[in-house]
A protein has these predicted regions:
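Short glycine-rich substrate-engagement loop in P-loop NTPases that contacts/grips substrate
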Residues: 2-29
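Conserved ATPase-coupling elements of RecA-like P-loop NTPase cores
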Residues: 3-7, 38-48, 72-73
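Conserved P-loop NTPase "ATPase switch" module shared by AAA+ and STAND
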Residues: 26-44
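Structural recognition of the conserved hydrophobic beta-strand(s) that form the central parallel beta-sheet
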Residues: 34, 59-65, 87, 96
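Conserved catalytic/switch belt of AAA+ P-loop NTPases
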Residues: 45-68
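Interdomain motor-coupling "hinge/lid" segment immediately C-terminal to the ATP-binding subdomain
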Residues: 73-192
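Accessory nucleic acid-recognition modules appended to NTPase machines
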Residues: 142-319
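Active-site ExK catalytic segment of metal-dependent nucleases
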Residues: 318-329
Length: 330
């Protein structure tokens, strides 16, 4: 398919050839043309400019890896202002539940008060939530969990992590790729601390901020981590009070974090006092990714020395909303 885009930039010629290739008519305003893995064909990315300008009556949807789109190709112009962006996130718990048990999902969505749930629903929702925390929201892993294929969940998540490691090498210089890998692999250790604050010494003994700032920025821009900065004063606007030198980082997905930390699924299924120490980190990661997936900017936290801390603070209009996360009963 990419050869078609390499040989011409004329949208009508491209559509005609794609129609021949697929043996399907591509009709204006009636056919949705989907170009998957578009990051592998930079010529197709550039062609979107001409689709927008010359044939806006054709509807085209492109899907691609943020890594490939952000870092993959030099010398090709991105059609700025010619495409609408939709950022995709890991599957949320509600989306997972809808596919796992539609009737339970309908009950879950009908909950509109903070009243205790009937035991029968509480138990079923707890089981579903445990399953979600094990698999996380990466679509292939979540589907394996819905199919009750626990081994498939583990294989899928490990394959994704392996693919990320290969992407580090593919899309960065050798020195930067090495530093990216060090930061990424330090994530479980960073979150194992009580205050979760990022410490460069956990990346590598003797590490300094100026050596690893680019690696952190790379991971953030690639969508693999979230960076949550300290806000000294919880007042609007939060950005005016943030301390960029003090921050926490979280994984894009709680399932990936679990596997990156080498925690087996059984950790969720047994009452292990050792695991309780890490439960808080996983709970915070879950809340963060859920808020982000629902359009909430969650890039600040508040702390008052060693006395008190609120895991996340969110600016909503002229108000600051505190989000405190508890992983157990309190």
């Amino acid at each position: 398919v990419c050869d078609i885009f390499r040989k011409t930039k004329n949208p009508l010629q491209i559509i005609e050839q794609l129609s021949y290739l697929t043996s399907e008519p591509i009709l204006p305003q009636k056919t949705l043309l989907i170009l998957d893995e578009i990051q592998d064909c930079p010529e197709a990315i550039s062609a979107m400019k001409y689709f927008c300008e010359k044939t806006p009556e054709y509807v085209v949807a492109c899907a691609g890896s943020l890594l490939g789109l952000a870092f993959g190709h030099q010398g090709f112009s991105f059609p700025v202002g010619k495409v609408d962006h939709i950022k995709m996130y890991p599957v949320t718990f509600s989306e997972f539940l809808e596919q796992r048990d539609e009737r339970l999902y309908q009950y879950y969505m009908s909950i509109d008060s903070l009243e205790p749930l009937p035991d029968v629903f509480f138990d079923r929702l707890s089981q579903a939530f445990t399953a979600y925390r094990i698999s996380g929201g990466m679509p292939a892993a979540a589907m394996k969990m819905i199919e009750k294929d626990l081994s498939g969940v583990e294989t899928t998540l490990r394959n994704i992590l392996q693919d990320y490691s290969l992407d580090f090498v593919k899309h960065a210089t050798p020195l930067l790729a090495n530093r990216i890998s060090h930061v990424w692999k330090s994530l479980p250790s960073q979150l194992a601390k009580e205050n979760r604050k990022f410490v460069y010494q956990l990346v590598r003994p003797g590490a300094r901020a100026r050596e690893y700032e680019d690696a952190l920025t790379w991971l953030k821009n690639a969508g693999l981590i979230y960076k949550v900065s300290l806000c000294s004063t919880p007042q609007v606007p939060l950005k005016s009070y943030e301390d960029l030198s003090i921050f926490k980082i979280y994984s894009l997905d709680v399932g990936l974090l679990r596997v990156l930390a080498d925690l087996s699924p059984e950790a969720y299924l047994v009452d292990n006092p050792i695991f309780k120490e890490y439960k808080g980190a996983l709970a915070e990661n879950y809340i963060l990714q859920s808020l982000v997936a629902n359009g909430v900017n969650c890039s600040h936290y508040w702390a008052s020395g060693n006395k008190a801390e609120v895991e996340f603070i969110v600016q909503r209009g002229l108000e600051v909303v505190p989000v405190e996360v508890k992983s157990g009963i309190s």
